[in-house]
Structures are given as structure tokens and as C-alpha cells.
Amino acid sequence: MKMKQISDTTLKITMSLEDLMDRGMEIADFLVPQEKTEEFFYAILDELEMPDSFLDTGMLSFRVTPKPDKVDVFVTKSKIDQNLDFEDLSDLPDMEELAQMSPDEFIKTLEKSIADKTKDDIEAIQSLEQVEAKEEEQEQAEQEAESKKEPYIYYILSFAKLADLVAFAKTVTFEMETSELYKMNERYYLTILVDIENHPSPYPAWLLARMREFADDSDISRSVLQEYGQVLMSHDAVLNLQKIG
């Protein structure tokens, strides 16, 4: 469970499905407002370390955004206290002026003062909607980028001499799926297929840098080698080269 303060009046609490289960809740509980849900919200607020701006009394509104694997709860603090204090409404006239006002005039003045106080709440809600929209766009972009990420990479290395190729093969200790050896235009080309799915994002670049200490990186694609090159070893080329000498 994570909490993020978006503004002075808004918090975002993110809970995983496991967080909900641990507290006896499920996503369906948020679909229909009920006393259990409200009690759960306030229990979460007690559990978390609240910012000072949320510690004073005031009405809190809760907005729930369910996701497939989590729930985002936006907590907005109203600037109108639950127990409205006329002293907080600075636009109200003093007692002498109140005595001269008709009931209709008093109600209109009171409504104006409250409207001014709730302006910040409306702006907070609008800001919250913008934050939600941006976060949804960011999450969608991250999901699309993740879906486009290839779990495998073919590295293609070029060697001028067979001896250099064999020497490189003997340095290989990283895991690979397979490797191929081609010859084209009097040069040797080694393709190495590596599974990067369970590795951190910098791993492919780190691995290439390590390979380039012993070999030249090639711009020639594997499809070109397959079409125009001579296949010397169609699989496990590195393992076979390691056996030489």
C-alpha cells in the first residue's frame, strides 16, 4: 500500500488486491456505497502516516478508481468543516448588520460565503480529474512499451580471423538460447540469441559492451546472412567453438 500527496487537499492511496484481501475487502465492495466502505477508508487513513494538512477536522471525500490489479483511492479534503462555524465565513456581516437583514438577504449572503469556500473544492476535483487522466495515459504508455518489448535479442558479431572467433567463444560465460556461425565476404559472423526477459533493462547494452571487447558489432542482419552467407554451424556454434584447442 502506497500513499502520495498530490496537493494540499488531495491524497492518492494505491492498494493492491492483496492489500484489500488482508483487510477483508474486495473490489466489488466499492461498487455500491455502504457503511463498510466508509469505515474501511477511515481505517486506512488511521493506518497511514497522514500529512499535517489532513490532521485537522474537515469533511473528506473519497473517489475510487478500480484497476485490474489494484485500486486507487483519491482522498480530497474539503475546506468546509463538518460543523460549519459562522466565524470562518469572513464575508458574513457583523451582528449589527445581521439584525438589519431580511431572512432572504441573510440566506443569499450565507450561500455566497459558502460558494466562495467551496470554489477551492471544485478546483481540487477538476485538478484531480486531470491527474487521473495523466496517470491513465502514462500507465497505458508503459503497458504498450512493455508489450512491444522483445523478450529475445539477436547479437551479430563480426570477426576477421577464425582464431579471434575461437578466442571469443572461450570467454563466453553468459546464458544463451542458441548461436550460429556464418561466413560471408571473407569474414566470420557469429549470431547469439539471448533471453533478456528476466533481466534488468540495462542488461542488453551491458552484454553488448562486453562482447565488443573481443569482437566487432555488425550492421548486417541475420536475414542477410541466412540469404547470402555460408552456414558453417546452424546451432550451438559457441559451444562447439569452445571445444576447439
Curated annotation (Swiss-Prot):
Pfam families: MecA. Homodimer. Belongs to the MecA family. The N-terminal domain probably binds unfolded/aggregated proteins; the C-terminal domain interacts with ClpC. HAMAP family: MecA. NCBIfam families: PRK02315.1-4. This is Adapter protein MecA. It comes from Streptococcus pneumoniae (strain Hungary19A-6). The gene is mecA.
